[in-house]
Amino acid sequence: MSQIHKHTIPANIADRCLINPQQYEAMYQQSINAPDTFWGEQGKILDWITPYQKVKNTSFAPGNVSIKWYEDGTLNLAANCLDRHLQENGDRTAIIWEGDDASQSKHISYKELHRDVCRFANTLLELGIKKGDVVAIYMPMVPEAAVAMLACARIGAVHSVIFGGFSPEAVAGRIIDSSSRLVITSDEGVRAGRSIPLKKNVDDALKNPNVTSVEHVVVLKRTGGKIDWQEGRDLWWHDLVEQASAQHQAEEMNAEDPLFILYTSGSTGKPKGVLHTTGGYLVYAALTFKYVFDYHPGDIYWCTADVGWVTGHSYLLYGPLACGATTLMFEGVPNWPTPARMAQVVDKHQVNILYTAPTAIRALMAEGDKAIEGTDRSSLRILGSVGEPINPEAWEWYWKKIGNEKCPVVDTWWQTETGGFMITPLPGATELKAGSATRPFFGVQPALVDNEGNPLEGATEGSLVITDSWPGQARTLFGDHERFEQTYFSTFKNMYFSGDGARRDEDGYYWITGRVDDVLNVSGHRLGTAEIESALVAHPKIAEAAVVGIPHNIKGQAIYAYVTLNHGEEPSPELYAEVRNWVRKEIGPLATPDVLHWTDSLPKTRSGKIMRRILRKIAAGDTSNLGDTSTLADPGVVEKLLEEKQAIAMPS
């Protein structure tokens, strides 16, 4: 695997990069051998009100999982993201907003964003929200979503952002679990030309008899669409901020005061409210942003993630703003109204750094050159990928077509629970291999272990664990520390278990193979679904694939592949045989799919993650309990897949 084609560091990157290979090695060694010294120094990336004396105080020990960083220091996140930039860079653009409709866009300076955040902070205080209260934010991708988040941080309220694609049931569950006192929403959201009934969803969520904590709903007017109104409870955003003062002194917060709760789907039971605190989280978000994207002042940065996901928290807002960057916020989708929309936005705003997801990349790849038609993308310097392992074919297409063969691709592996990047290239320090997340970030100590938790050395494959803490690590699950310990620290003692499997090659590069529960065991051989999917997608006629295991009398598990073809391609018996032979040739006979299920679309969450749990159930013919489908972008896909399944002959 180490013999795979390596992409060397381009000269234009090497000439001005923040970290070169020698610096990476020296800094990484210090970060794991002397974490107090290293993180004590790196913590200075922020402005502290009371400087910290203690740096690291952490334990992964069974029954005593405790994570504290900079615990005697005080600061305010919003002051670090706004106030400290005003004197020298107040007129610099903080947020470029690009609407769903390309004719709508605006630039908001640091000065203007600071004013809006102070006004909304005063509004929250007027509504009786105080330090420690939880505020639910259910908004579209508009600047006011950022204003609401920063205003919460400014007064010390804990925000719980709920992705705008979630159903009323999902919204209610998150409000109940966090006891939110206030909900901030919009009349409607806009996405790919369609309106999304956000206020109606909130109204429906609040009808749940178990929602008892909410006192008010603040509503932003985005479309002017018709909505129901409950006097006394519902309040217009514009009415409130008009009367609010633009003067506000940011609240002094302890580094370990809660900053936000973000719910992530559990494979079983209710969603998990991942809790991040203020100091360590922001140090880590700022430092990873600066070094992984090789950020230079003046760069225009675009992260396509929604604020409802951790990527939107750390790398659309907090990391970039802490560094004084210009961050682009996009309301739309990358391939609407034309497949070239993403490339058009890059050209329009002269984007230098683009961070998006493999799902978007594969969707554009299926369109071929239409995805870049009429654009030159010459402003781009760095590309990034997030959300799932990227298959080498999509990586190469992204590098070649979007980045004109000159932009390093930082393939970042991390999770909601990690707060920031864990395994990732650094543009000036890492030679790249398509499909590999490469090397750990500073302070991150990954290891591969076998099923008993024994460390595996050298080039090998196993479960990916982290053996010591890092500042961005989640501190607990909201209101359920026992579940936190059970979920992340009980599988392997004294280690954080990511739930992912990985392979390490001869160069020490890590290749994420997917969730450990996405590893198939075919005739005693372990096969990562990501590897089979990658082979399928490498076929010139295939746009997307998802592979699951189904029970098999002889092999233990058989391979069931859902396959979406490129536009203009049609399924046929000949293609069926061709695709099976293709995988056999790419990986070996063991990996040959037993079943190919042709389909137009896969069940995905709004963030583009494929819901494999549902695919496993459908493939196995188990439709008794498909679980929570409220997070699906298009719940109708499930019915369609079930219908298609009826016509498929299953292996015995």
UniProtKB/Swiss-Prot annotation:
The record's annotation in PROSITE patterns points to: AMP_BINDING
Q: Which GO terms describe its biological process?
A: acetyl-CoA biosynthetic process from acetate; chemotaxis
Give residues where N6-acetyllysine occurs. K609
Q: Which residues bind Mg(2+)?
A: V537, H539, I542
Q: What CDD domains does this protein's entry cite?
A: ACS
Looking at the Swiss-Prot or TrEMBL record, what is one Pfam family this protein matches? Answer: ACAS_N
> Which reactions is this enzyme annotated as catalysing?
acetate + ATP + CoA = acetyl-CoA + AMP + diphosphate
Enzyme class, first EC level, given as a word: ligase
Cofactor(s) required for function per UniProt: Mg(2+)
Please give one Gene Ontology molecular function term for this protein: metal ion binding
Listed A to Z, the keywords are: Acetylation, ATP-binding, Ligase, Magnesium, Metal-binding, Nucleotide-binding
State if Protein biosynthesis is listed as a keyword.
Answer: no
Source domain of life: Bacteria
- Binding residues for CoA: R191, A192, G193, R194, T311, N335, S523, R584
Cellular component annotations (GO), alphabetically ordered: cytosol
- Assigned EC number: 6.2.1.1
Q: PTM per UniProt? A: Acetylated. Deacetylation by the SIR2-homolog deacetylase activates the enzyme.
Which residues hold ATP? G387, E388, P389, D411, T412, W413, W414, Q415, T416, D500, R515, R526
InterPro entries per UniProt:
Ac_CoA_lig, ACAS_N, AMP-bd_C, AMP-bd_C_sf, AMP-binding_CS, AMP-dep_synth/lig_dom, ANL_N_sf
Family the entry assigns: Belongs to the ATP-dependent AMP-binding enzyme family.
Instruction: Give the protein's biological function.
Output: Catalyzes the conversion of acetate into acetyl-CoA (AcCoA), an essential intermediate at the junction of anabolic and catabolic pathways. Acs undergoes a two-step reaction. In the first half reaction, Acs combines acetate with ATP to form acetyl-adenylate (AcAMP) intermediate. In the second half reaction, it can then transfer the acetyl group from AcAMP to the sulfhydryl group of CoA, forming the product AcCoA. Enables the cell to use acetate during aerobic growth to generate energy via the TCA cycle, and biosynthetic compounds via the glyoxylate shunt. Acetylates CheY, the response regulator involved in flagellar movement and chemotaxis.
Q: Which PANTHER family match?
A: ACETYL-COENZYME A SYNTHETASE
Q: What is this protein called?
A: Acetyl-coenzyme A synthetase
Provide the species name: Escherichia coli O6:H1 (strain CFT073 / ATCC 700928 / UPEC)
